[in-house]
Amino acid sequence: MAKEKFVRTKPHVNVGTIGHIDHGKSTLTAAITKYLSLKGLAQYVPYDQIDKAPEEKARGITINITHVEYETEKRHYAHIDCPGHADYIKNMITGAAQMDGAILVVAATDGPMPQTREHVLLARQVEVPYMIVFINKTDMVDDPELIELVEMEVRDLLSQYEYPGDEVPVIKGSALKALEAPDDPNHEAYKPIQELLDAMDNYIPDPQRDVDKPFLMPIEDVFSITGRGTVVTGRIERGRIRPGDEVEIIGLSYEIRKTVVTSVEMFRKELDEGIAGDNVGCLLRGIDKDEVERGQVLAAPGSIKPHKRFKAEVYVLKKEEGGRHTPFTKGYKPQFYIRTADVTGEIVGLPEGVEMVMPGDHVEMEIELIYPVAIEKGQRFAIREGGRTVGAGVVTEVIE
């Protein structure tokens, strides 16, 4: 009889290359795929294919982003790379492609540069939990002491932004040399690539899956079913829900209502359990149709609270991206789209010395909504005005 096919189910991890322009991010990405293709663990994606990244849209913003995938003996990786500096900022803020760990690429010839710092700051703000350093172009530096110096500078930079600078793995090599090396995986030039992959396998832990987090479902729609009660529908963002589970309805006021989900349905069939990613309807015990609305969330008790004021990193769209043509100042009142909630808010605080925000800027700001919404650190949102997206942001701190 035919043998069963052996399917490997390796843990999945999302990573990305970050760092200053021309330090070799795309070259390194290409080199990883080339090396692993020689071991049968990836498809080789050449540099020019990575560099001409396709456009995708996230929260109304166009971003150029390349996705490659590859495997090591231990894991399956999805790896993102962006060609332009602005694309990185937009990606990190919109969370178009989130990272469980980042590979910070620093050229030995330059050391840390302004964008190196900006990417590390953003990675910290959006909570990229782990950082690995690849010091690139080491073949172009004759003095080993200079490379040591660059390593010290990078470790110091990471420590400034609360990464464990002393513990972060630092790999030194040349991505270009690996890319140009012969097709023998044991060739000397691939050593740093293997070291980098080992560091990724061992230093970045398996991420917690969405399904294992506390339950949360943004409410998209509300129905009343005669004789049965009120049903709310939406896509489960995280966790799992079973009939009989207690939940809270949160948002649009400071009052939190407790209820029990008596039935979970998908395509009109009852489910034993709904999990992250499922589009479901939840029947709620003792809740009238007018007591719950779109923009609220259904969540595990105590897992999230309603808030009005928060700090956020925001990217403001350029005119060419369909954004505003003019700057705005403190007191600007656009609409904030947070999950399914659409709520007016005011920019109540800008950094010291910043009087106005120009289209194309990336800035930290304090925002106050007219009513509370379920918000937490790391929450992504869109800013809209007159029916068009003018910005995107990520919550960095909840104030009240």
Swiss-Prot record:
<feature type="region of interest" description="G1">
    <location>
        <begin position="19"/>
        <end position="26"/>
    </location>
</feature>
<keyword id="KW-0460">Magnesium</keyword>
<feature type="region of interest" description="G2">
    <location>
        <begin position="60"/>
        <end position="64"/>
    </location>
</feature>
<keyword id="KW-0342">GTP-binding</keyword>
<dbReference type="InterPro" id="IPR009000">
    <property type="entry name" value="Transl_B-barrel_sf"/>
</dbReference>
<feature type="binding site">
    <location>
        <position position="26"/>
    </location>
    <ligand>
        <name>Mg(2+)</name>
    </ligand>
</feature>
<dbReference type="GO" id="GO:0005829">
    <property type="term" value="C:cytosol"/>
</dbReference>
<dbReference type="InterPro" id="IPR009001">
    <property type="entry name" value="Transl_elong_EF1A/Init_IF2_C"/>
</dbReference>
<comment type="subunit">
    <text>Monomer.</text>
</comment>
<dbReference type="InterPro" id="IPR027417">
    <property type="entry name" value="P-loop_NTPase"/>
</dbReference>
<keyword id="KW-0378">Hydrolase</keyword>
<feature type="region of interest" description="G3">
    <location>
        <begin position="81"/>
        <end position="84"/>
    </location>
</feature>
<dbReference type="GO" id="GO:0003746">
    <property type="term" value="F:translation elongation factor activity"/>
</dbReference>
<dbReference type="InterPro" id="IPR004541">
    <property type="entry name" value="Transl_elong_EFTu/EF1A_bac/org"/>
</dbReference>
<dbReference type="InterPro" id="IPR031157">
    <property type="entry name" value="G_TR_CS"/>
</dbReference>
<dbReference type="InterPro" id="IPR041709">
    <property type="entry name" value="EF-Tu_GTP-bd"/>
</dbReference>
<feature type="binding site">
    <location>
        <begin position="136"/>
        <end position="139"/>
    </location>
    <ligand>
        <name>GTP</name>
    </ligand>
</feature>
<keyword id="KW-0251">Elongation factor</keyword>
<protein>
    <recommendedName>
        <fullName>Elongation factor Tu</fullName>
        <ecNumber>3.6.5.3</ecNumber>
    </recommendedName>
</protein>
<feature type="region of interest" description="G4">
    <location>
        <begin position="136"/>
        <end position="139"/>
    </location>
</feature>
<dbReference type="InterPro" id="IPR033720">
    <property type="entry name" value="EFTU_2"/>
</dbReference>
<dbReference type="InterPro" id="IPR004161">
    <property type="entry name" value="EFTu-like_2"/>
</dbReference>
<dbReference type="Pfam" id="PF03144">
    <property type="entry name" value="GTP_EFTU_D2"/>
</dbReference>
<dbReference type="GO" id="GO:0005525">
    <property type="term" value="F:GTP binding"/>
</dbReference>
<keyword id="KW-0648">Protein biosynthesis</keyword>
<dbReference type="Pfam" id="PF00009">
    <property type="entry name" value="GTP_EFTU"/>
</dbReference>
<feature type="binding site">
    <location>
        <begin position="19"/>
        <end position="26"/>
    </location>
    <ligand>
        <name>GTP</name>
    </ligand>
</feature>
<dbReference type="InterPro" id="IPR004160">
    <property type="entry name" value="Transl_elong_EFTu/EF1A_C"/>
</dbReference>
<feature type="region of interest" description="G5">
    <location>
        <begin position="174"/>
        <end position="176"/>
    </location>
</feature>
<keyword id="KW-0479">Metal-binding</keyword>
<keyword id="KW-0963">Cytoplasm</keyword>
<dbReference type="InterPro" id="IPR050055">
    <property type="entry name" value="EF-Tu_GTPase"/>
</dbReference>
<dbReference type="InterPro" id="IPR005225">
    <property type="entry name" value="Small_GTP-bd"/>
</dbReference>
<feature type="domain" description="tr-type G">
    <location>
        <begin position="10"/>
        <end position="208"/>
    </location>
</feature>
<dbReference type="InterPro" id="IPR000795">
    <property type="entry name" value="T_Tr_GTP-bd_dom"/>
</dbReference>
<dbReference type="GO" id="GO:0003924">
    <property type="term" value="F:GTPase activity"/>
</dbReference>
<comment type="similarity">
    <text>Belongs to the TRAFAC class translation factor GTPase superfamily. Classic translation factor GTPase family. EF-Tu/EF-1A subfamily.</text>
</comment>
<feature type="binding site">
    <location>
        <begin position="81"/>
        <end position="85"/>
    </location>
    <ligand>
        <name>GTP</name>
    </ligand>
</feature>
<comment type="function">
    <text>GTP hydrolase that promotes the GTP-dependent binding of aminoacyl-tRNA to the A-site of ribosomes during protein biosynthesis.</text>
</comment>
<keyword id="KW-0547">Nucleotide-binding</keyword>
<dbReference type="Pfam" id="PF03143">
    <property type="entry name" value="GTP_EFTU_D3"/>
</dbReference>
